[in-house]
């Protein structure tokens, strides 16, 4: 019984790691990255609201970067549809 519980816990942790990623947050309305200048609090709120665990404003790209968010919440160059 104890082995089964341990296997289930390990499997759950692996699934959490596989489903999360790091990247720029996606504005689903425009298809663009969520922009920022210096507001880490705003980016962190967007990131946590999207299922990530920490977000910050990446100043050189002027966009919110999120760690641990689902891939569906992140901007990807391959699927870019931003018209801004």
UniProtKB/Swiss-Prot annotation:
- Signal peptide range equals 1-20
**GO cellular-component terms in the record?**
extracellular region
Matching Pfam families, A to Z?
Toxin_3
Q: In which tissues is it expressed?
A: Expressed by the venom gland.
Ranges for domain LCN-type CS-alpha/beta come to: 21-83
The answer to keyword Glycosyltransferase applying to this record is no
The record's section on InterPro entries has:
LCN-type_CS_alpha_beta_dom, Scorpion_toxin-like, Scorpion_toxin-like_sf, Scorpion_toxinL, Scorpion_toxinL/defensin
Q: Which GO terms describe its biological process?
A: defense response to bacterium
Q: List the disulfide bonds.
A: 32-82, 36-57, 43-64, 47-66
Q: Give the location in the cell.
A: Secreted
Q: Which UniProt keywords apply?
A: Antibiotic, Antimicrobial, Disulfide bond, Secreted, Signal
The GO terms describing molecular function are:
sodium channel inhibitor activity; toxin activity
Q: Does the keyword Metal-binding apply?
A: no
The protein's superkingdom reads Eukaryota
> What protein family is recorded?
Belongs to the long (4 C-C) scorpion toxin superfamily. Sodium channel inhibitor family.
Q: What does this protein do?
A: Antimicrobial peptide with activity against both Gram-positive and -negative bacteria.
Name recorded for this polypeptide:
Antimicrobial peptide MeuNaTxbeta-2
């Amino acid at each position: 019984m104890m082995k089964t519980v341990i296997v289930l816990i390990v499997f759950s942790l692996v699934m959490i790691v596989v489903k999360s990623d790091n990247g720029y947050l996606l504005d689903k309305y425009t298809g663009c990255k969520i922009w920022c200048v210096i507001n880490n609090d705003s980016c962190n709120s967007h990131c946590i609201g999207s299922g990530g665990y920490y977000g910050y404003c990446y100043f050189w790209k002027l966009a919110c970067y999120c760690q641990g968010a689902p891939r569906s919440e992140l901007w990807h160059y391959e699927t870019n549809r931003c018209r801004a």
